[in-house]
Amino acid sequence: MNINDYLTYSATVTKENNFYIIKINSLEQETCTEDKDKIEYFAKSLILDYAESMIFLKRPIKPNKIKSQDNLLINMEYDFALKCMIRNIMYETTTRPSELASLLNISKQSVNNILNLKKKTNLDTLALCFNVLKRPLTIEA
């Protein structure tokens, strides 16, 4: 699992009538806006909504596998990417949030706050999640 797969998503933007259609290629999701200046904002919102819906449905969050310089590249936060990776590890290992809470010796509500995609979380806390899931976080240059 590579953080870069969750950091940058490729989007295609087409103009139809007065709307800009934004498609996140690897996720097969799309949205639209009338405001050209809000394209990146709507693209990020679409990626975030997609990830949250996958968490709700208890499915893995797809990484970006389509990398093309011809398309608009949407840069997500490192916090978002790490949380997607943790959620996917939990999915692979069938680890429930309550089990992660037990491993971390904290409440389930605290785990939900840590893994909330809309809240920022300290890198040390996220690294601890990787450790207790037996997939230590490694950073290479």
For each predicted feature, which ranges?
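DNA-contacting interfaces and partner/effector-binding or oligomerization modules
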Residues: 1-58
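Alpha-helix boundary/interfacial micro-motifs
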Residues: 34-35, 42-43, 75-76, 135, ...
